[in-house]
Swiss-Prot record:
Taxonomic classification: Eukaryota, Metazoa, Chordata, Craniata, Vertebrata
Basic and acidic residues composition-biased segments: 1-10, 154-165, 279-288
UniProt DNA-binding residue ranges: 98-157
Recorded name of the encoding gene: vax2-b
Top-rank lineage group of the source organism: Eukaryota
One cellular component (GO) term of this entry: nucleus
PANTHER family, sorted: HOMEOBOX PROTEIN EMX-RELATED (PTHR24339), VENTRAL ANTERIOR HOMEOBOX 2 (PTHR24339:SF34)
Family annotation (SMART domains): HOX
Protein name: Ventral anterior homeobox 2b
Biological function: Transcription factor that may function in dorsoventral specification of the forebrain. Regulates the expression of Wnt signaling antagonists.
Annotated family: Belongs to the EMX homeobox family.
Protein's cellular compartments: Nucleus
One biological process term in Gene Ontology: central nervous system development
Statement: the UniProt record of this protein carries the keyword Transcription regulation: yes
Keywords of the record: Developmental protein, DNA-binding, Homeobox, Nucleus, Transcription, Transcription regulation, Wnt signaling pathway
Length: 294
């Protein structure tokens, strides 16, 4: 029965009767045969399409409208090896936006703006309009210049305050050191024991007591310069007079400068003195000095 149908409808096919019979043999169903014989459009017969893969890609790219694209611009770049690569710029990057130009002021304009800034740091209203007209500038340029100038002034003030604080801390430390020097806690060097014993002997023989005079306002030091050809006296200047009204204490270093200091008696309390290591010296000379005085 299928053969009869094919024979009746074969004139409709014309030259393609042989191809229709081949399709019937391949598919083996009547419905497929009827569908293949009904229409001869390009959609039903994709074999007759002559479009290449390259042309299909071009059609896909052309179908996309520039408004729907997710990129701003595509740039073809050829690298050193000769390979062409495509760089896709994001949509948020606006390359067509005009760049802002920097305003270059003349010397006369800067001089006038600086004068106005020294007079008033905030120029608004008619003053700004008049100043912009006189300097041949826009009000926006004048306003931005004043904003930048105020920012620069704040930075300079903060930098100056930091320098002042550092110098103040250094001067405070110097005053503390000088105060300790005046109080005799750093460089107070007592007289050698043989000199003290000679002064005591002279005081007892004359009956006037000891020759060491102490007052409530000064440190206990020798009032007269000790005899000797190599005696050296040092007086610390009072640079911290505003902080401490105490008078400077004279220090006496008997002997030559390069000869070194004499030993310090163990009974003299130095506390946190700079000469504390000298208290650990040998006490043989002190013992001999005591025997000579007795």
């Amino acid at each position: 029965m299928g053969d009869g149908v094919s024979e009746e409808r074969s004139p409709l096919c014309g030259k393609s009767a042989t191809s229709c019979s081949e399709r019937v043999r391949d598919r083996g169903t009547r419905a497929d045969l009827e569908c293949s014989l009904r229409g001869h459009s390009l959609k039903d017969i994709p074999v007759t399409s002559t479009s290449s893969p390259g042309s299909s890609k071009e059609e896909v790219l052309d179908s996309q409208s520039p408004g729907e694209a997710d990129y701003c611009r595509r740039i073809l770049v050829r690298d050193a090896k000769g390979t062409i690569r495509e760089i896709v710029l994001p949509k948020g990057l606006d390359l067509d936006r005009p760049k802002r130009t920097r305003t270059s002021f003349t010397a006369e304009q800067l001089y006038r703006l600086e004068l106005e800034f020294q007079r008033c740091q905030y120029v608004v209203g008619r003053e700004r309009t008049e100043l912009a007209r006189q300097l041949n500038l826009s009000e926006t340029q004048v306003k931005v210049w004043f904003q930048n100038r105020r920012t620069k002034q704040k930075k300079d003030q903060s930098r100056d305050s930091e320098k002042r604080s550092s110098s103040t801390s250094e001067s405070f430390a110097t005053c503390n050191i000088l105060r300790l020097l005046e109080q005799g806690r750093l460089l107070s060097v007592p007289a050698p024991p043989n000199m003290i014993s000679s002064q005591n002997n002279m005081g007892t023989s004359s009956g006037n007591g000891t020759s060491l005079g102490t007052s409530g306002s000064t440190s206990p030091v020798i009032s007269t310069t000790p005899p000797g050809a190599g005696a050296f006296s040092l007086q610390v200047p009072s640079l911290a007079a505003s902080s401490s009204p105490r008078l400077p204490t004279p220090f006496y270093f008997p002997g030559p400068l390069l000869g070194g200091l004499h030993e310090i008696p163990s009974g003299y309390g130095l506390g946190s003195s700079a000469f504390e290591p000298y208290t650990r010296l040998d006490r043989k000379d002190t013992a001999s000095g005591k025997k000579s005085t007795s």
